[in-house]
Amino acid sequence: MSRHPLVIVGSGPAGTATALALHALDPALARDAVVLEKARHPRPKVCAGGLIPAGKRWMEEHGIALSVPHVTVHRAQVTTPRTTVAHDERDLCYVIRRNELDAALVDACRARGIAVREQEPVQALTRTGDGVRVSTPAGTYDAPLVIGADGAGSVVRRRLVDGGRDNIARAIMADVPVAGTRWDGYANARYDFDFRLLRHGLRGYLWAFPCTIAGVPHINIGAYALAPSGAPLDDALSAYLHELGAGVPKRVAFPIHWYRPGARLAAERAWLVGDAAGVDPLMGEGISLAMEYGDIAAAAVVAARRSGDYGAALYQQALEQSWLGAKLRRLHLATRLFYGPTSRFCFPLAERSRRLRAVGLRWYNGVDGWDRRSGWSAVAALLTNRIGA
C-alpha cells in the first residue's frame, strides 16, 4: 500500500491535464500524486481526433508543443437540412490521432516527474475514514482525494459519485484511406459536417475529417447522435460512406457521456473531469474541454489541500461558476436550439450570415478568448463587424 495526496484514475487528456495543471500550481504536490492507466501507451483510442484551437493553446500555455502528426484544417463544409455552406478560416482545427496525442501528454507528465502507472486497471474503490482506497492488480493506493478521468464509462463516477447513465450519446466511426474515394477534403484542408440526420429525427450529424495514419492520408468518417439513435444511425453512416465512395470499412461504435446542467460532478473525496464529468452535447467534442476541466480541478485540489475540505461543493461550485461551466451550459442550450423544433430557424440564420458563423466558430473554438466573453460581446461584434478584436 502507498499513500499519495491525490490519485487520478485515467491518463487521457483529462487526467494528464489535471496532473500538468497541478504541476504548474504546485510542482511538489503533483510529483507526490499518481496517475493510474489501465492500458499501456500508446494505446488505441476511438475518437475523431479533432483538437480545436483552445486545446492547442492550452498545450502551449503548459509548455507542450503540438509535435504529433496532425492535419490542420482551414475550411469547413456544412450541409444543413436545407443546403450546403462553405466557410474558410485559418486554423479551424488540428486533426490528431488520440493514441499519439495521449502518449505525448503522458511523456510531458513524466518529464515533470509526475508518476503515471500503466497497466493498472482499477479493481475496487473503497471509502476509508480519511479518504479513498484504490485497488489495482499491482497494489493499493490511499489518498484523501480521487479524481475520475476515466472516460464515458467512468468507474469513479459509477461507484463513488453518480451511477446514472441517462445522458449518453452514441457515435460510430471508420478510418478509410483517401485513395480510391470521392472525397476531396484532405487535398483542400477541409472538414465536413452534415446535419441531414435531423430530417430523419436523429439529433446529431455526420462528419468527415482529414487525418494521417502511419503517414498515409485517411478520412475519419463518423456519425454522432443523442439517444435514442440505434439502427437509424448505422444506416445513415452506411449511406454517407457510400456517398463518399468509401466502401464498407470496419466500424467502431462508442458512447459519449455529455454534460447535463445540474448533474453531480463530485462527491465527498471523489471528483470527475473530462468525459467522466461530461463533454459538449452539441458536437461531442471533448479533448479541449478535458484540458480545461484539468485547470479547474487542479486549482480546486490546491484549495482543498490548504483547507482540508475535499467535499463535493468545493469542486462542483468552482466548475459551475467558471467560464467553462458557462460554456457547457450554453452548449447544452445550443443542443436544444439546433436539434429541437427551433432548428428550422437557427440553421437558416447561420446559412445566411457569414458574420454569425464566424462569431459562432470563434466562440466554439476558443479563439481570441471568445468562449470567455459575454453574450453582449457577441451581439456587439455582430453589429459592428469587429469579430477579430
Regions found by a protein language model. Name each.
Residues A21, A108-A246:
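Predominantly flavin-linked oxidoreductase catalytic cores and closely associated redox partners
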Residues G15-T16:
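N-terminal Rossmann-fold NAD(P) dinucleotide-binding loop
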